[in-house]
């Protein structure tokens, strides 16, 4: 359908549109017109992605004089592929109606591991090894050496791409990762470097958050992006955590041991170069004296991760004299490693500010703050000079230089925390030194400052007023949408007690109570006997899940569950979990039914959909608070209170409830779908807790469903399933119109009414 929103003609590839999609587009257009940033919470399963893509691409077509670029950030490769699939459909529709003027270039960008087509490189076991294997075949010095020694192995795809030079271009179209690989194989060009090259010409780019938020990656991937770009962070409920992780570094004993080995190897290489090619080291020294850290623009194969500090915090001056000579720099790093080793050798938890840490480092190891700031750039320069390609082997020394650069650059918003062991396993010595960032606004500020509009959107952004405070920005539009429905296809319930009327909760003093564990088990036994197909259970942590499953196994509860449905469990091993998910789906497909045990904040809670028969019921056991005794969390809470006046309890509740909402939202992925949500903890019945759930869940949470026992929940579930068994009328009856036609939109435009009756 084609319709107008004010002066923009919107091309939408479906015959009908949901009222909330239309409203979403109206609010998004307001933000684009104002050239400002916005926060939009849209219920899951209501076509948020296609609404966003339709409006922004149509907005671009309506402003041919000032075309905008869309940068769409997703959390996972699966979401990236899904977004590009939707964009393909939309692009075909627009080209059908507008011809060649609607043609765009859109592509996804991911790591070498996901884009490489060289089978020998792909044989490496992990992402870092794939990067190193690629570098061994594409570095400029390796390619130069191959002219003298034909036995040196190069990458044919990269060589062909380099030979094509300016002609290595992608024709207009929408390219998924699979399309890029196929195109690369067909032309004999490297898809990874081709995609990197095409970013500057593309109208739409879809990639991971890190490509914009992590300075190390953004520094060489996204630095050329124009200001007239609209940046979208999809599924952005955890964006503050992504920002914090981008600027945090952890150092363990194993890191220091690896870094020492790296320095030994670097020292050997320096000695070898002194004997065979001393001029190269001299040239590097002269370059550093002149203040040129790197040799101009590096070719693709030579590029390294950028500086870990944010662009405006990097010093634009010459490297300090005491680390210009390679051997002097190695000596400084040795002293730094010795100092870190001494600090890790402690029996007490220590917490201090970067200023205090740098002062102590200066007095005990003689390393100044300015020297620390340049550690990462100096290491990068040295490794290029020494022509080192085994980048995966040198990760430990890179981590230490990351740490040094960040601790030397930032005085506020960070803490250094040294813990001799994990508090949850105090009998195992495992010292860790963490430079922890507490201020999410630091990493995202360059994005807000640089780009015209930033859209933060998700199904879970409640309470929506907390995000501007956490990220320190002022949105021009901030809106939470409700879900229009022809039938009440979601049924949230709060279970506060078992059939024996004992209260249930995962509060620390109650979670191990045999009565609570028994009631949680009995709830599931009763539910699996009446709910068809798939049931998903989320626990607050891996340790709690392991403990409760072990108890259920001993008491025979697990056996009772398995008489009704097969049981699959998420583990911390990605391969095991993927296999368990695959078998869970097969059990649901063949009618046997299955239960999947998972963990809030785990991989499954964040990125796997349990739509249709894969998830007819989700049980959230407990309130998924973070581990509140964590020293890093305590330091962050202190910082948030002092800087943004966010109370400790408010933040902890907000964080726990967004995770709970994310877990239960996994079961509804469209309006034709249906599912039940059970919040099994007495704390959810308190207004201060449940009020922080998204509006689209709260609007279906009736007062009669707030303080249930197991037998009451069973009765409600039976009634709900009976209702859902009736034929589904997707057009809407009884005045609850949830699909708008083109005529409806035209009428609304005439009357000026934008809010339809839900």
Swiss-Prot record:
ATP binds at residues 42-49. It catalyses: Couples ATP hydrolysis with the unwinding of duplex DNA at the replication fork by translocating in the 5'-3' direction. This creates two antiparallel DNA single strands (ssDNA). The leading ssDNA polymer is the template for DNA polymerase III holoenzyme which synthesizes a continuous strand; ATP + H2O = ADP + phosphate + H(+). Expressed at low levels in all tissues. InterPro entries: ATP-dep_Helicase_C, DinG/Rad3-like, DNA/RNA_helicase_DEAH_CS, HBB, Helic_SF1/SF2_ATP-bd_DinG/Rad3, Helicase-like_DEXD_c2, P-loop_NTPase, RAD3-like_helicase_DEAD. Changing residue 521 to E: In uvh6-1; confers increased sensitivity to UV light and heat, yellow-green leaf coloration, and mild growth defects. Its EC number is 5.6.2.3. GO terms for biological process: DNA repair; nucleotide-excision repair; response to heat; response to UV. It is an enzyme of class 5 (isomerase). Gene3D superfamilies: P-loop containing nucleotide triphosphate hydrolases. PANTHER family: DNA REPAIR DEAD HELICASE RAD3/XP-D SUBFAMILY MEMBER, GENERAL TRANSCRIPTION AND DNA REPAIR FACTOR IIH HELICASE SUBUNIT XPD. Belongs to the helicase family. RAD3/XPD subfamily. Component of the 7-subunit TFIIH core complex composed of XPB, XPD, TFB1/GTF2H1, GTF2H2/P44, TFB4/GTF2H3, TFB2/GTF2H4 and TFB5/GTF2H5, which is active in NER. The core complex associates with the 3-subunit CDK-activating kinase (CAK) module composed of CYCH1/cyclin H1, CDKD and MAT1/At4g30820 to form the 10-subunit holoenzyme (holo-TFIIH) active in transcription. Interacts with GTF2H2/p44. ATP-dependent 5'-3' DNA helicase, component of the general transcription and DNA repair factor IIH (TFIIH) core complex, which is involved in general and transcription-coupled nucleotide excision repair (NER) of damaged DNA and, when complexed to CDK-activating kinase (CAK), involved in transcription by RNA polymerase II. In NER, TFIIH acts by opening DNA around the lesion to allow the excision of the damaged oligonucleotide and its replacement by a new DNA fragment. The ATP-dependent helicase activity of XPD is required for DNA opening. This is General transcription and DNA repair factor IIH helicase subunit XPD. It comes from Arabidopsis thaliana (Mouse-ear cress). The gene is XPD.
């Amino acid at each position: 359908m084609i319709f107008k929103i004010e002066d923009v003609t919107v091309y939408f590839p479906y015959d009908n549109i949901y009222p909330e999609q239309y409203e979403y587009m109206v609010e998004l257009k307001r933000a684009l017109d104002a050239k400002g940033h916005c926060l939009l919470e849209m219920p899951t399963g209501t076509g948020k992605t296609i609404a966003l893509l339709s409006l922004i691409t149509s907005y671009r077509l309506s402003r041919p004089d000032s075309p905008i670029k869309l940068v769409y950030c997703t959390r996972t490769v699966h979401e990236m592929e899904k977004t590009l699939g939707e964009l393909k459909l939309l692009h075909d529709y627009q080209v059908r109606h507008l011809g060649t003027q609607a043609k765009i270039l859109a592509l996804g960008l991911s790591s070498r591991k996901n884009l490489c087509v060289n089978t020998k490189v792909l044989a490496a076991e992990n992402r870092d090894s794939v990067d190193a294997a690629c570098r061994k075949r594409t570095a400029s010095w390796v390619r130069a050496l191959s002219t003298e020694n034909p036995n040196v192995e190069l990458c044919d795809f990269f060589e062909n791409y380099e030979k094509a030079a300016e002609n290595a271009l992608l024709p207009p179209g929408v390219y998924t990762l699979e399309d890029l690989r196929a195109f690369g194989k067909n032309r004999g060009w490297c898809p990874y470097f081709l995609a990197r090259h095409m970013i500057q010409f593309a109208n739409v780019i879809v990639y991971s958050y890190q490509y914009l938020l992590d300075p190390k990656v953004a520094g060489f991937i996204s630095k050329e992006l124009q200001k007239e770009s609209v940046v979208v962070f999809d599924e952005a409920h955890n964006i503050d955590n992504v920002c914090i992780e981008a600027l945090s570094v952890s150092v363990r004993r194993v890191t220091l041991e690896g870094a020492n080995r790296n320095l030994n190897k670097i020292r050997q290489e320096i000695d070898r170069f002194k004997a065979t090619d001393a001029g190269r080291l001299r040239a590097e020294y002269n370059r550093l004296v002149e203040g040129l850290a790197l040799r101009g623009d590096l070719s693709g194969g030579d590029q390294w991760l950028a500086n870990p500090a944010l662009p405006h915090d990097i010093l634009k001056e010459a490297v300090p004299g005491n680390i210009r000579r390679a051997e002097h720099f190695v000596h400084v790093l040795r002293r730094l490693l010795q100092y870190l080793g001494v600090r890790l050798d402690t029996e007490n938890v220590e917490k201090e500010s970067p200023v205090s840490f740098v002062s102590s480092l200066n007095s005990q190891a003689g390393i100044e703050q300015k020297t620390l700031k340049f550690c990462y750039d100096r290491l990068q320069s040295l490794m290029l000079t020494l022509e080192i390609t085994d980048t995966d082997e040198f990760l430990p020394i890179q981590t230490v230089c990351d740490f040094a650069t960040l601790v030397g650059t930032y005085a506020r918003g960070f803490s250094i925390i040294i813990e001799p062991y994990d508090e949850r396993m105090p009998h195992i010595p495992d010292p860790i030194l963490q430079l922890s960032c507490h201020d999410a606004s630091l990493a995202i500020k360059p994005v807000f400052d640089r780009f015209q509009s930033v859209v933060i959107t998700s199904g879970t952004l409640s309470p929506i007023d907390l995000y501007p405070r956490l990220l320190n920005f002022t949105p021009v539009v901030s809106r939470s949408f409700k879900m229009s429905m022809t039938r009440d296809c979601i049924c949230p319930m709060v279970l506060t007690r078992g059939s024996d009327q004992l209260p249930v909760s995962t509060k620390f003093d109650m979670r191990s109570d045999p009565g609570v564990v028994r009631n949680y088990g009995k709830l599931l036994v009763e539910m699996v006997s009446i709910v068809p197909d798939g049931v998903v259970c989320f626990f607050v942590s891996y340790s709690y899940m392991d403990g409760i499953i072990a108890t259920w196994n001993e008491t025979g509860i697990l056996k009772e569950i398995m008489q009704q449905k097969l049981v699959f469990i998420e583990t911390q091993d990605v391969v095991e979990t993927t296999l368990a998910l695959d078998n869970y789906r097969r059990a649901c497909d063949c009618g046997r039914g299955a239960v999947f045990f998972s963990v809030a904040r785990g991989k499954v809670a964040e990125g796997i959909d349990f739509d249709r028969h894969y998830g007819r019921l989700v049980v959230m056991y407990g309130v998924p608070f973070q581990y509140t005794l964590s020293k890093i969390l305590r330091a962050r809470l202190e910082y948030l209170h002092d800087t943004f006046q966010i109370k400790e309890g408010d933040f902890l509740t907000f964080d726990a409830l967004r995770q709970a909402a994310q877990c239960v939202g996994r079961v509804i992925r469209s309006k034709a779908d249906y599912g039940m949500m059970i919040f099994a903890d007495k704390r959810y019945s308190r207004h201060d807790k449940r009020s922080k759930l998204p509006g689209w869940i709260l609007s279906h949470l009736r007062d009669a469903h707030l303080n249930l026992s197991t037998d009451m929940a069973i009765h409600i579930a039976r009634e709900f399933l009976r209702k859902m068994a009736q034929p589904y009328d997707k057009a809407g009856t009884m005045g609850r119109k949830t699909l708008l036609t083109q005529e409806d939109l035209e009428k609304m435009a005439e009357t000026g009414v934008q809010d339809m009756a839900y």
